[in-house]
Amino acid sequence: MSSQEASKMLRTYNIAWWGNNYYDVNELGHISVCPDPDVPEARVDLAQLVKTREAQGQRLPALFCFPQILQHRLRSINAAFKRARESYGYNGDYFLVYPIKVNQHRRVIESLIHSGEPLGLEAGSKAELMAVLAHAGMTRSVIVCNGYKDREYIRLALIGEKMGHKVYLVIEKMSEIAIVLDEAERLNVVPRLGVRARLASQGSGKWQSSGGEKSKFGLAATQVLQLVETLREAGRLDSLQLLHFHLGSQMANIRDIATGVRESARFYVELHKLGVNIQCFDVGGGLGVDYEGTRSQSDCSVNYGLNEYANNIIWAIGDACEENGLPHPTVITESGRAVTAHHTVLVSNIIGVERNEYTVPTAPVEDAPRALQSMWETWQEMHEPGTRRSLREWLHDSQMDLHDIHIGYSSGTFSLQERAWAEQLYLSMCHEVQKQLDPQNRAHRPIIDELQERMADKMYVNFSLFQSMPDAWGIDQLFPVLPLEGLDQVPERRAVLLDITCDSDGAIDHYIDGDGIATTMPMPEYDPENPPMLGFFMVGAYQEILGNMHNLFGDTEAVDVFVFPDGSVEVELSDEGDTVADMLQYVQLDPKTLLTQFRDQVKKTDLDAELQQQFLEEFEAGLYGYTYLEDE
């Protein structure tokens, strides 16, 4: 592949931007993965890796996870804040606290803990807190407790504090403080408290409701004052050590971040004036990732990088401290998405392709209905030299004629053969118009989009959108999707991807297409009998956890991939994936009972004993097989 072709391919899929140096296209036109861009010689051909794994029995779909990417992301964020602190002369520390709700899998938590980097952990529920406390002995850093809290949750956090961990119980509802003080006295432990302030500042986009004045969590200004007085009266004002706020997830615009940090810095200043010795400034989440690769303010992109993000936070807090003669607090960020998104790729196979194949029909008979003759006349005019009608007009005329024919077919005016003839001619017209369109002509752009969607291949992919990419369905989030090979060719085809659930919502609606977003995916030419494998990238944040059981499709297999500078690769199976029996048990259908019921039915048939046994064995094998489609 020439450098010019490679550059064009990278621009088509924006790999250079969302790939963030972890993903690239190699000289074979395959996706390659470099888990640590600081060690560029440690890379693997993902297409070849998947084929090797398949030959060894790997089932698709499967998650290919790269723990080394997690560790590099953590190092990169820590390094950005180190540079920002040095640049400003900031005296406080910095900790990244990983909110495990983003991805609670053991491989994620332990990969981050074993990275050698400073790291804290955040919990938002009792179950998460138990996981965090169990791992806390490996990290000896900071634990932040968010979310709704009952007495058991609060006791667990205080037990962690009594064990020697630095556990911050963040007060998000006024009702929590009485329980905290009561249980702290019972356990004879000094609580370490935080307060979540509800800001007026708010981000924009799909996740904006998680921040701002209408946020589900946090205390309003009046409630913050009430909390301070309650603690003062209880003689526990010194326990309030952390200020927390959250602007929203996936903040696209750096200006929104800067505005929110400045507002929260005022809370820090005012709390100090009230005698509260705040030591930690937790800015929460919000550090976004560029799913689109457009470097813009759109919902699934960001217009800033790690350095700019860190600089805006450190300088805003530092300036507020300097102006008011206050100490520089320890800065905490809860950057879960930015740590985990890149490290996981869902790989699956295409199980079927439906192309809009067509043949130009012969001319209609002389006494054919007027609509058929009109379509044919338009077709002939399209091939006459010097015609003055526009491409758009030809397309509109043919669409109106086809619409009349469809209505006429429903009323019995047109036969099935006539409808098929009209549809074939219409496809021929679309193809002819498509050839004459110029992507550089702005007037042609809407027609190009319309025809690309109309003529796109339908690719049926062996996965469940609801299980593996629920945010693509629930909030129209865009994820990078592209073939793992064939990227040394110009993407001359278009496709739409459909999953294997029995739900029309099981389709991907938005795809990266250069600097824009399209409703069809650019595809290089391929053999429909042997289509390429597809990679769904940046699914490491939230998707595994939010996935649901629609049609009883379960968790996919998952492998952890480690790549070394000498070119060697180690692959470990981290999740065998759900079986049919696993999924049935989730809905209280006992596999053994089902097998017994099926056996009873088979025995009542007139089938011979050998066939009965064969059917029973097939049923039982299916119960303990993969929930996704499997080749023979």
UniProtKB/Swiss-Prot annotation:
GO terms for molecular function: arginine decarboxylase activity; metal ion binding. It catalyses: L-arginine + H(+) = agmatine + CO2. Substrate binds at residues 281-291. GO terms for biological process: arginine catabolic process; putrescine biosynthetic process from arginine; spermidine biosynthetic process. Its cofactor is Mg(2+); pyridoxal 5'-phosphate. The modification N6-(pyridoxal phosphate)lysine is found at residue 101. It holds the Pfam family Orn_Arg_deC_N. HAMAP family: SpeA. This is Biosynthetic arginine decarboxylase.
